[in-house]
Amino acid sequence: MSVNPTSVTNPPAQFPEDFVFGGATAAYQVEGETRTHGKGKVAWDDFLEAQGRFSPDPASDFYNQYPVDLELCEEFGINGIRLSIAWSRIFPNGTGEINPEGVQFYHDLFAECHKHHVEPFVTLHHFDTPLPLFEKGDFLNRETIDAFVDFATFCFKEYADQVTYWFTFNEIWADASNTYIEGTFPGGVKAHLAEAFQCEHNMMLAHAKAVLAFHNGGFKGKIGVIQSLEFKYPLNENDPADIKAANNEHVLQNQFLLDATFRGDYAPDTLECANRLAAVSGGTIEILDEDLEIMREAALYNDYLGVNNYQCRFLKAYDGENDLHHNGTGEKGTGRWRVKGIGEHVNKPGVPTTDWDWIIYPEGLFDLLVYIKQRYPNYKQIFITENGMGYKDPYKDGFVDDQPRIDYIEQHLRWLLKAMEVGVNVGGYFLWSLQDQFSWTNGYNKRYGFFYVDFETQKRTPKASAYWYKHVAQTRRLD
């Protein structure tokens, strides 16, 4: 995991002319209308209703408000938008019957994007497997892999004239970890490392099959996958136990998935660590020879990698039992992550954190990008598909002064430019999020957007960060 920092001078202030300045969304977090217009159920519907904490309806009412949001994109210099297609809005049961109203909705949405000169970057799965497939085991069941490939192929054909940039999955690590380690997603399993690894492998196999369907189908455009990646640092760089803890989680979150993406298999050191960690929870990982044949072939056709990065992690050795608590309220200091066999997340003195205990250390993005370039020289291009800062965003006198978010974005963009200076090919940056949205585990009090959303009236108000980003996007400079 070592990175050899190349000599870095002051970064160039200028972004390339073709650099994408984007904003990101996800269907379930913005659309609303989760049980109308023919949409089928997903596991989140009943899961959130049973919790009773918050509802995904109406979220940002993007299903009805998207013309407003895309007009704002054009006004504020945002020339790319990450969207996801809700699988169950197209196939209500995951397979079989098609919902024509859902199909037409995305045609209309993509047309509106192009009307406002905003390029859609489209994800096919963003934590929202249709309920009938989820109940059969989600991606631990290989039938879901085939169903996903059928859904993906339908979308490739249906929207071929409107979508150029495709992503198969959003954040395979987050899907696996929140379902099988932290237990904050539907299913709620905690600290089962073998199932987390199996989920990662099976989703990467589904990605590979979809990439081959895209390539062999002769579709125009480009395709890749979005991985949620965090650089891991040992708290004490001279302590072998801390170094091992950092490497354990690095393999679990980063290296296992990146090997699958760019090698199409798993390097011996990756597989040794993965098998050792899976055994901690009493399980094994099923990796078939035919899986690797498919993955190796697909690895040739990844046009880009989407990197979602908000923070890095500092780890120290931990020998106790599992102790996990998700900070879903913004009460600073309440989050805990101690996993048997891996290690413990800790804060480093002098490094700031958000109210949700997320670390603010933009150098971590630089180290991560350089690591990818060094270990996987066959990568072609990277997009920063999510980066941003959750903030409570007080609305006062018709305005939101979110200077901490501006500072966060600016620092990360400067380190991004440093990575580009040393040869990392980055094609664009998407803020999470375009507008304030529903959060899977935080509801509505954790805001990320450029545009403040009054969830009662659905009125949009540009924040200070939107005006700052507009200047950067239009001048392509960091002053």
Stretches found by the model and what they are:
Residues G40-F76:
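Aromatic- and Gly/Pro-rich amphipathic surface segment
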